[in-house]
Amino acid sequence: MDAQTRRRERRAEKQAQWKAANPLLVGVSAKPVNRPILSLNRKPKSRVESALNPIDLTVLAEYHKQIESNLQRIERKNQRTWYSKPGERGITCSGRQKIKGKSIPLI
């Protein structure tokens, strides 16, 4: 007998002793689930009742007012007083381009 078979026999004896001492743990390899169990505290709504009931539009109207007020605030922010408004031709350049010391007006 070589050392490997002797080791296997010793380990088999140890495993048999452990299985005899712990019969409930033999073959159990799964971990217990630690996730919380979710429960519904309220009574679930019936889909038929919710389909037949009209939709409450007051919340939607309030949301629409909120969006409009935000839009007006953004427009006021974009129309600053210190910026000049574009004329009839739109935004035109009034700068000059410098190449080799010459000043050439931008078109």
Swiss-Prot record:
The coding gene here is N
- What keywords sit in the KW lines? DNA-binding, Transcription, Transcription regulation, Transcription termination
Q: Which GO terms describe its molecular function?
A: bacterial-type RNA polymerase core enzyme binding; DNA binding; RNA binding; RNA polymerase binding; RNA stem-loop binding; single-stranded RNA binding; transcription antitermination factor activity, RNA binding
* BP terms from Gene Ontology: DNA-templated transcription termination; regulation of DNA-templated transcription elongation; regulation of transcription by RNA polymerase II; transcription antitermination
Q: Residues annotated as region Disordered?
A: 85-107
Record's protein name: Antitermination protein N
Please explain the role this protein plays, according to its UniProt record: Plays a role as a transcriptional antitermination factor that allows the virus to initiate its lytic phase. Activates expression of the delayed viral early genes by modifying host RNA polymerase (RNAP) into a form that is resistant to termination signals. This antitermination function requires the host NusA protein which serves to stabilize the interaction between antitermination protein N and host RNA polymerase.
* Complex and partners: Interacts with host nusA.
Native source organism of the sequence: Escherichia phage lambda (Bacteriophage lambda)
